Amino acid sequence: MRKMGGGKQMKLGILCTMINGFGRRGYYNSQEIGLGRALARKGHEVMIYKGIDPSEKEEKVQVEKNLTIWYLPMKHLGAHGFMDCKYLDPQLKALFCFGDQQIFLPHVYRWCRRRRIPFVAYVGTAHSLDSNFKSKVMNALFAAGTLRIYKKNPVLAKTSAAKEELRQLGVPHAVIAPVGLDTAVLKKNIPADEKMRLRKEHGFEADDVILCNVSRLSWEKRPLELIDLFLQVKGKKKFKLIIVGNGPLEEELNEKIRKNGLEKEVKIYPNVPYEKMWEIYEMSDYYLNMNKGEIFGMAIMEAVYYKTSVAAIRALGPSVTLKDMKGHKLCENDDE
C-alpha cells in the first residue's frame, strides 16, 4: 500500500442497514456519503453498503475517486435491515456501521470478528423514539444483541447526549464524533439577487415571509402541529409555508390544509432532489423544526449554512447545533 499523509491507504467499509428516510438516494445530505468522502480524500478506498427496501432497484454508484455506494435491497423488520454478509468485502481493514438501535447487527459483527476486521459503531440514539408495544420489543431485542456489541467494541457517538445515553446503558468508552455537512454537495457563491428570482420561479411574492420545514411526514416530526402553528400567525404578515417531505401523515396533512383553506398559503414538495434543496433554504426567511426528540437535525445545519434563521423546539440536536448562535432561536414550546 502506498503512503497517504503519513498513513497507509486502506480498504474501508461503511454500513447503513436503516430502511427508512436515512440516506435516501439523491434527496438528502447523506451522512454516510459525507463520512465516505472524508475517508476517501484521505486516500482510502471506501465502499458504502446502504440498505434499501426490496421493492427498490439494486445499484452501485461511483460517487468520486475511491468512493462507491452500493444500494442493496434488504429484508427488513420495519426500519431494521438484515445485511447479507456475502456482499461484504473480506479484505476490508475496518467496517464503520451506522448502528443506532438496529437489531440485525450481531451476525455482521461475528462476520467481522472471524476475519479480524474492526467493527466500529456510529450511534445517534440507542432507543426507539416510539413508545408502543412493538418499539418496546425492538428495544429489548437491541439490548439482548447489538447493545452487547457496543459494550465490547469502539463506539462513536454523534452528540454528547448520545454518549451519555450510551454510558447509562453500560457503554463507557464512546467517543464523540459529530456529524458534519457534506460540503461537496452544498451550493456555493449564490448571487445576491437569487432569492427574488427563486421566489418568482416558485410562485411567491418578494414581500412574502416564507417559513419552511424539511422532514419526513411522520408523527414525531409533528407536521400537523406545524399547520396549527401556521394558523396562529396567518394574517399577521404575508406568511407562506413550504413543507418538503413525504411519509405516513401525507394524506392527513393535505386534508388539514384543505379543511383550513390554506391551499394558497402552504405548498408541499413531496420530493426535492438534493441538488435543488438549496433553493428551498435560499428563498425562505425561517426554518422551523417541530421535532421534540430531534437527535441531530441535518436540515437545521443546512438552513444555518444557507443563512436561513432557524426556530427549533429545544431538543438534543438543536441544543448543540444552535448553541450561542445569533439569529436563531431554541423554543421551549410551540407558543414561543
Predicted regions: what they are:
Residues 151-176, 181-188:
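A short, active-site helix/loop in glycosyltransferases that binds the activated sugar's phosphate group
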Residues 292:
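Aromatic "clamp/platform" in nucleotide-sugar-dependent glycosyltransferases that forms part
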Residues 309-312:
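Short hydrophobic beta-strand element within catalytic cores of glycosyltransferases
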Residues 254-272:
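Nucleotide-activated donor-binding/catalytic signature segment of Leloir-type glycosyltransferases, i.e.
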Residues 324-335:
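Conserved acidic donor-binding segment of nucleotide-sugar-dependent glycosyltransferases
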Residues 13, 156, 199, 205-221, ...:
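Conserved donor-binding/catalytic core segment of Leloir-type glycosyltransferases
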Residues 127-151, 162:
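Nucleotide-sugar donor phosphate/pyrophosphate-binding loop at the beta->alpha transition
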Residues 271-272, 279-284:
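Short alpha-helical donor nucleotide-sugar binding micro-motif in glycosyltransferases
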